[in-house]
Amino acid sequence: MKLLKWADVPAKDILNELNLTKPPFDPFEIARLMGVSVKNDLDLDKIDNDGMIYLNDNGEPEIWINPMQPPKRQIFTLAHELGHLVYHVLPNIDKFKDPIEDNYSTLYRNGTRNSQETLANRFAANLLMPVFSMSDVIDDFFEKAGGKQNLTRKNVIDMLVGRFSVSKDAIIVRLKQLGAIPQDYEYDDETKQKME
């Protein structure tokens, strides 16, 4: 199975192997380049899920993404499912008990502290918003603005949402993970806070 070469490969190495260096990082294109089958047909039996990964009739991993979800949510969900593929399915393909089903609770951490889900979320963040690219984009934005003192956090967040084609919430979580904004930062409460 050609997909086995991706077992346990970190997101940054996948991007490097596929020569993807500039945002946005489209997980549908990444999946295609990796050789992963992705379905996003309307399936009422799966509609309560945002996405899932399972073995198809040929024993090959296949990912399903709910087409009823907003596009940016589909993007994060697919990146998350690719994380499951890389870390939980391919390394244990012979023992894989499918499917892994993901919904709002597992994807968006509503108190969930499942290590598999945390790892898949981390993979998704690294795939969609890699540190090397975030840093380059932010530095370029600061330069064009004449310095970070001329920008608010909202300015930077809004720009990143546009450049990386992910949700505002995904960008905020990622910036908090990277220590670029305080953990207690709230987008809607910002009152002209300049970048630090």
What are these regions (language model features)?
Residues 1-196:
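Active-site hotspot residues in diverse enzymes, especially metal/ion-binding acidic/histidine motifs
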